[in-house]
Amino acid sequence: MTALKVGSESWWQSKHGPEWQRLNDEMFEVTFWWRDPQGSEEYSTIKRVWVYITGVTDHHQNSQPQSMQRIAGTDVWQWTTQLNANWRGSYCFIPTERDDIFSAPSPDRLELREGWRKLLPQAIADPLNPQSWKGGRGHAVSALEMPQAPLQPGWDCPQAPETPAKEIIWKSERLKNSRRVWIFTTGDVTAEERPLAVLLDGEFWAQSMPVWPALTSLTHRRQLPPAVYVLIDAIDTTHRAHELPCNADFWLAVQQELLPLVKAIAPFSDRADRTVVAGQSFGGLSALYAGLHWPERFGCVLSQSGSYWWPHRGGHQEGELLEQLKTGEVSAEGLRIVLEAGVREPMIMQANQALYAQLHPLKESIFWRQVDGGHDALCWRGGLMQGLIDLWQPLFHDRS
């Protein structure tokens, strides 16, 4: 068979996203491709194509920024790395005409963060990869799952929901703002007995990566009980950064204003042991804060990549919530908690490990998971479903 000429039309038609080759039982060599729409270097003004892979080349790694290399005389850019056989994560490309974003040969963490902040608004998904969505930072990303990546319950066999989610507008007197909220119900159990799950960053789980098919699938397979799901929009990054980190007003507004509104539409159980609060990053911090401060209402906490360093971004001081646990100001006694963090988000992992060590005496009701991934919704979506399964498992015994 004649080899295709690199950069020819037929060569590009043979490409369907990243390609990998097994190196050994644990590692693969992975090559990424991008086609320059301006053509070869003779015609193109593109100087760099940055590769932003969550948990591999992002600012969490404090690593040298990585750029694709052009194959001379062609419209082909490529970049090769090595990934674990069980790795899963999202990535994007950032073509740019500038070559001065990262000035130092080895930028420090702050410069890395600032450089990526400037570049990411220009990020694009991989045009060769059909699996893409709008990430939490607002830019497009694509999915990469290596052959031995762990199963993600519900996402492996999604089912269309019988009833669509209902979108409402919550106008909060306490918070003095308005936002969208999505209400989703599954199953046909007696309404007042249905458990409740509150999902933070609701617009992401409702629109960018809709959870309805995965929840429907797991309910049909009896891995999740019939339930009511409430997805709360964060409004924008400014409101998110103010309302989610340890904010009593936000959670009082949820309890006093939003939940009665939801209950009139979709009745649910008031029992704390049937109620889950789930969140990621600031949302993970917020979920545990709610459980620790209102355990009579929120008895189950699902925290993924929780920002337990808050409010000390450098990671050199213990976060506020951990300090409160250590001094006895709050207690996790009686809560069921799922705590998950990625090995490729070092500062987040360190803070979560410190928190887990503090919670470890309650190990019967703590589920601790380390994921081979970064600060990444593609990882979180599987942990979200598994976390709901773990936290609500006792309900199946209640009904039997």
Where are the language model's segments positioned?
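Aromatic-rich carbohydrate-binding modules that target alpha-glucans
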Residues: 2, 23-25, 29-86, 96-153
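Short beta-strand segments enriched for Tyr within beta-sheet-rich domains
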Residues: 87-95, 194, 250, 254, ...
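Active-site nucleophile loop of the alpha/beta-hydrolase fold
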Residues: 202, 234, 302-311, 343
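Short beta-strand element of the alpha/beta-hydrolase
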Residues: 182-185, 192-203
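Primarily recognizes the serine-hydrolase "nucleophile elbow" in alpha/beta-hydrolase
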Residues: 210, 270-324, 330-331
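Cap/lid segment of the alpha/beta-hydrolase catalytic domain
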Residues: 198-266
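Post-His helix in hydrolase/transferase enzymes
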Residues: 379-389
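The feature captures the conserved acid-bearing segment of alpha/beta-hydrolase catalytic domains
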Residues: 309-378
